[in-house]
């Protein structure tokens, strides 16, 4: 009797030990995957991306050029010049469209793939990167809508491009659908339709010639949307501060009178999601603005608005500075700890101020 109890006790302890080891291994795997999948994607070169999608190849520097002492600034400048030469052969609007396709592709194929619709660990636990994806997705949707409704149409009475009419709705598919159909499958269809539009931009023989109009009124209409997006992000980022609201030149009372209500305070458990949503939106908008700077180059020079776009780009670049803490710090005033959300709100507010200037410049005759 005692012997059987002893054997049973040993078996139960062995089972518990095995289960404990398996649990420790599982937790370790989930932790490692969480660190890998939770990384924000790196920035990319919009010209290099457009050239790659067009099937062009950058020329290699001749022997002796960019080799000895060429690595570094000279090598980088040579490579950039090579991209600019090749990009000059691309039709107007190709770089902008290729940038949207690259942003969508990054959402699907970054570390861990698209995570918002995951139903199992570790993806279901990663709320920061899912917020990042939502921020980037909103900017992608706005830019694809602008391409369909404004940039590709000559007048309000003009017919819309057939491929863009297919591409845009796919990007508006619900972001958290796991299956039947999966979100990734729908977004992939949007990318494919966008590529068909890009092919017709380069080669009219592949169907009805695609159009892209880089006009001031088109850019003005898109800038209106950007202003609203940035304003919303700036307000939500700063709403957890002691002053409850943040806007240059406005007091709390003036803000309440202007909006007609008191802005809800975002709690500490939610502000990290808003912070990463703003990071994702800034990442996507940064690349879109670089593409606009390229494809709207002539109109921006003519309107003397190039510096305004550069200010927006610089502030968004600053907003993407790597954080030193694994947690979103929520300090106050001149306290010991930084306040990441207020720092981000400051950069976005300055980018929004430049967007207001850009809208006014584009709206002038």
Residues of each region from the PLM?
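Amphipathic, non-membrane alpha-helical segments in soluble helical-bundle scaffolds
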Residues: 94-97, 101, 130-137, 157, ...
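N-terminal Sec/ER secretory leader and immediately downstream segment
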Residues: 48-186
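Extended amphipathic alpha-helical interaction segments
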Residues: 184-313, 320
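N-terminal positive-inside, membrane-proximal cytosolic segments immediately preceding the first
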Residues: 1-18
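A cross-kingdom marker for long, charged
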Residues: 31, 35, 39, 44-54, ...
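Hydrophobic membrane-insertion alpha-helices, especially the h-region
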Residues: 17-32
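A cross-kingdom feature marking solvent-exposed beta-strand/loop segments within repeated
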Residues: 117-128, 181, 262-272, 325-343
């Amino acid at each position: 009797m005692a012997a059987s109890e002893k054997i049973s006790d040993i078996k139960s302890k062995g089972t518990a030990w095995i289960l404990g080891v398996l649990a420790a291994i599982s937790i370790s795997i989930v932790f490692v995957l969480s660190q890998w999948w939770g990384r924000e994607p790196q920035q990319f070169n919009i010209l290099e991306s457009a050239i790659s999608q067009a099937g062009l190849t950058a020329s290699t520097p001749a022997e002796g050029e960019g080799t000895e002492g060429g690595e570094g600034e000279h090598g980088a400048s040579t490579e950039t010049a090579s991209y600019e030469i090749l990009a000059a052969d691309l039709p107007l609007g190709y770089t902008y469209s290729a940038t949207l396709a690259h942003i969508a592709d990054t959402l699907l194929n970054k570390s861990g793939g698209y995570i918002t619709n995951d139903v199992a660990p570790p993806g279901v636990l990663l709320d920061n990167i899912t917020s990042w994806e939502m921020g980037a997705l909103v900017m992608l949707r706005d830019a694809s809508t602008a391409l369909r409704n404004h940039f590709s149409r000559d007048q309000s009475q003009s017919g819309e491009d057939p491929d863009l009419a297919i591409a845009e709705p796919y990007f508006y598919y619900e972001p958290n659908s796991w299956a039947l159909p999966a979100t990734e499958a729908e977004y992939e269809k949007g990318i494919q339709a966008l590529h068909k539009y890009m092919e017709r931009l380069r080669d009219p023989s592949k169907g009805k010639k695609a159009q892209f109009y880089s006009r001031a009124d088109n850019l003005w209409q898109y800038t209106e949307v950007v202003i609203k997006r940035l304003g919303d992000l700036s307000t939500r980022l700063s709403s957890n501060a002691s002053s409850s609201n943040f806007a240059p030149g406005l007091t709390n009372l003036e803000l309440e009178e202007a909006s007609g209500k008191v802005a809800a305070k975002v709690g500490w458990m939610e502000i990290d999601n808003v912070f990463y949503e703003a990071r994702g939106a800034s990442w996507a908008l940064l690349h879109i603005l670089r593409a606009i700077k390229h494809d709207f180059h002539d109109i921006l020079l003519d309107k003397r608005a190039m510096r305004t776009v550069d200010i927006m780009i610089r502030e968004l670049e600053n907003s993407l500075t790597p954080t030193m803490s694994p947690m979103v710090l929520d300090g106050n005033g001149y306290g010991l700890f930084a306040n990441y959300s207020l720092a981000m709100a400051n950069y976005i507010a300055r980018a929004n101020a430049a967007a207001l200037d850009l809208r006014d410049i584009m709206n002038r005759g």
